[in-house]
Amino acid sequence: MADETRANVLLAVQELNYKPNAVARSLMNARTKTLAIIFPNVSDGFSGTVLSGVEDAAHAQGFSIIVCKTGGGRERTLDYLQLLAEKRVDGIIFASEVLLPEYATFIQKLRIPLVVLSGESSDPSVPTLRCDDRLAAYTAAAYLISLGHERIGMIYGGAYGTPEQNGRVRGFEEAHRDHGLALTEGQVQLMDGFAFKDGQVGGQRLLATLTDLTAVFASSDELALGVMSAAHARGLQVPDDLSVMGFDDLPLAEMCLPPLTTVRQPLYGMGRRAASLLLDHLQGIQKLGENVVFPTTIVERQSVRRR
């Protein structure tokens, strides 16, 4: 193209405010510059914090995000996977769910890069990004025990299957064994999910049947707030009558009264890293590699006291 012609074309582009058509561009380079993230629920603080990290990393590379909420249902998940295939997304983040074999097979047949974030994978070839749930829960239980609590209840959401499969339950139980403390029936309560209402129901069960509890460890901050609500309904003060500890360190943990002592997992950073792994893979910088384990820390606030 001659210099004069090129200059005229660029001038016309500027005057008409022309923008390249994203669909047409994707047809040429076989990329849509779109990532998808699949959650069981999008109305909680966990999903919002993770999504913020994913979106920031994607936006910096000119990618957009499609968010899918499955409700944890098999049929809805498969429907979304079919939809994402039709939309030709460049990568998928499977968040806070179990990656069943049929999901993994479907995605891999389409050759769509995939990572699992804060969930379980049935396929060891799929990279996972998560905290060491067993160690985190062990540390939390040991922390409460070190403060003199010997009768500690636990509430956890059952998204990952049986208690034996759930790392947070294993860590809680191991801490009790290592400190010579026996767990009694009903001391660990399995709930359907990790929401506030699940914490309320689980808290009511614990406090009605195990009246000698001095602390409750909940496997999410929203569960912990539900426990605090259940305690308040029974006339119990937190932490004077009952200490409550959560997991995640969502923004609401420091907004509640009293502010919640919790286990912090770096959710924003986990989301950002998950997106970055996919983006680096797509750009040929590095292949999807090994699993990534993130550290956790205990954030001490005012919902736990020494016995």
Question: What are these regions, as identified by a protein language model?
Answer:
Residues M1-K33, R305-R307:
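N-terminal helix-turn-helix DNA-binding module of bacterial transcription factors
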Residues E15, D56-Q61, A85, K109-V116, ...:
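Bacterial carbohydrate/catabolite-sensing allosteric modules
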Residues E15-N21, E75, A95-E97, Q200, ...:
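Short gly/ser/thr-rich secondary-structure transition/capping motifs
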Residues P20, N29-S43, Q61-F63:
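Interdomain hinge and pocket-entrance segments immediately C-terminal to HTH DNA-binding domains
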Residues A24, L78-L81, A104, A141, ...:
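Short hydrophobic/charged patches on amphipathic alpha-helices used for structural packing
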Residues F39-D56:
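N-terminal winged-helix
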Residues N41-D44, G71-G72, G157-P163:
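Short histidine/acidic/glycine/proline-rich micro-motifs that form metal-
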Residues D56-A104:
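Central regulatory/effector-binding core of bacterial HTH transcription factors
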